[in-house]
Amino acid sequence: MSIYVGNLSYDVTEESLNAVFAEYGSVKRVQLPVDRETGRVRGFGFVEMGSDAEETAAIEALDGAEWMGRDLKVNKAKPREDRGGSRGSFGGNRSNNNFRNRY
């Protein structure tokens, strides 16, 4: 399971984020999505810790904490399928049904 880290400074690096979370245990992976057009960090990231206990400790300590001039939003990351409706399938299914009903 991963940790979602939001409201990050655009100056953050994977190394600096790793250092903050390393205070709460072993960091397995840090991911900072980048904007395709600008190449700039998008203001959020994901951190994977060594154990659930380490994740819980990091979330409890860092959620709402100020870092690099920003108040962090830190919680368990939701799997892609649980984050809400996907954009692609919603419109596609509806148009196929309308086509069948008309002809």
UniProtKB/Swiss-Prot annotation:
InterPro entries: Nucleotide-bd_a/b_plait_sf, RBD_domain_sf, RRM_dom, SLIRP/GR-RBP-like. GO terms for molecular function: RNA binding. Residues 74-103 are annotated as: Disordered. Residues 92-103 have a biased composition (Low complexity). Residues 2-79 form the RRM domain. Disulfide bonds: none annotated. Keywords: RNA-binding. It comes from the Bacteria. Residues 74-85 have a biased composition (Basic and acidic residues). Gene3D superfamilies: 3.30.70.330. This is Putative RNA-binding protein RbpB. The lineage of its organism: Bacteria, Bacillati, Cyanobacteriota, Cyanophyceae, Nostocales. The gene is rbpB.
